[in-house]
Amino acid sequence: MSPEEVVDRVYELISFSAGSEPDWPAHRALFTEPTVLALRVFPDDPQITVMDYDSYVVHQMRDGLSEEGYVEIPGERSTTIVGEAAVVLQEFAMKFRDRPPVPAFDAYSLVRVDGVWKIASVISDMITAQQILEEPLTVR
């Protein structure tokens, strides 16, 4: 898979129907060990939390989310690949049941390990009305 395909797969696997959970083993396989995630996981989180993958799983499934279901919808993206390293800047929408979509932003750092692209880190935050991204994402 290319870096973009890895990121697409992350969004597919983190989305799930009410009464279930993400396919955590398949999702985990897309990340390096260790990995670092620095995220505002939910729109109401007061700050970004820095965590490892296992802590992220616990944080993501809090507040009865498995009963509601959850979907992440990818939007615009920019990718830069330099040798065995890649950066994918990705806009997406968080969709919770009975709530309007919440615009957000992920920055993925990927590395090619034994010929396979894996996510080494993710930073993420919500996009506020004042921060709506009017220009395409870029790292240059």
Regions found by a protein language model. Give the residues of each.
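Short beta-strand edge/turn micro-motifs at domain boundaries
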Residues: 87, 103-133
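Terminus-proximal functional modules
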Residues: 6, 77-80, 91, 133-140
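Short beta-strand segments enriched in hydrophobic/aromatic residues
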Residues: 14, 31, 92-94, 123-124
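Hydrophobic pocket/interface hotspot
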Residues: 10, 27, 35, 88, ...
